Amino acid sequence: MAAEQYYGTGRRKTATARVFISVGTGKVTINDRPLDEYFGREVARMIVCQPLEATDNVEKFDIKATVKGGGSFGQAGAIRHGLTRALMAYDEAMRSTLRAAGYVTRDAREVERKKVGLRKARKKPQFSKR
């Protein structure tokens, strides 16, 4: 396999991604499937490739990711976060560019739990005055 590979763990909502990058031709594999096949929506594919575009490394690295949990956009965000960390492991000079783009910070927004006595997390039952 690759002589030197760099690793990053990414998380978003309930999705967790393990991302390995190695110098190559720009091949992206997610759960042993190509990027186009794994993500049907173009927006999800764009989210995954954003760190590469921000650092002008689109066809410089081969990416192999395994991702579990969450939906398609949560998984795409987790891969983006892991890819960002892997790129920083490869070259620490990329950190400032990636931070300016907002990819270094983990998006901490999670689903709020449903509370007892309410219909959803915050939706209350209809109020009747009389």
Curated annotation (Swiss-Prot):
Gene3D superfamilies in alphabetical order: 3.30.230.10
Family the UniProt entry places it in: Belongs to the universal ribosomal protein uS9 family.
Keyword terms of this UniProt record: Ribonucleoprotein, Ribosomal protein
Domain of life: Bacteria
UniProt keyword annotation of Transcription present: no
Alphabetical list of PROSITE patterns matching this protein: RIBOSOMAL_S9 (PS00360)
GO molecular function: RNA binding; structural constituent of ribosome
GO cellular component, one term: cytosolic small ribosomal subunit
Keyword Ribonucleoprotein: yes
GO terms for biological process, alphabetical: translation
Descriptive protein name: Small ribosomal subunit protein uS9
